[in-house]
Amino acid sequence: MSKTALVTGSSRGIGKACALKLAELGYDIAVNCNSNLEMAQKAVDEITSLGRKAVAYKANTADIDEVKDMFRSIQQDFGGIDVLVNNAGVVDDAYLLMIKDESLERSLDINIKGYFNCARQASLKMLRKKSGIIINISSVRSVL
């Protein structure tokens, strides 16, 4: 039986690299993007060329309803997940006293609330199976 990993923000960058590596290790991949489904589909194509199953899901991880819908779809398509890689994130390059309120809210929504939303949904499934792995990726920019 194959194992499945959901990698948020996996249409490009570090998330895509993680998704490709997990595919090389034998995982089927749920590719998540916030907006660019075309780019996510390119990641899916690369993963399937490695012989693994992959499906793209467009969902804003900061929106709990979109996250719940994504997890329901993943359950239908893959039968659940074994690994969650919380990678989706944004960086608004500004110092503490210069950051705009909108940028701060966007960063908190995606970088914290989004991770929590996905981890909570994954945990509900993983607890039932009594197994699972959650990996949270951050960066040096998380330091104010």
Region annotations inferred by a language model:
Residues 11-13:
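Conserved glycine-rich cofactor-binding loop
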Residues 25-40:
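Conserved glycine-rich Rossmann-like NAD(P)H-binding loop of the short-chain dehydrogenase/reductase
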Residues 37, 58-70, 101:
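The beta1-alpha1 cofactor-binding region of Rossmann-like NAD(H)/NADP(H)-dependent oxidoreductases
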Residues 87-92:
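Conserved NAD(P)H cofactor-binding loop of Rossmann-fold oxidoreductase domains
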Residues 95-96, 103-108:
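Substrate-binding pocket helix/loop in short-chain dehydrogenase/reductase
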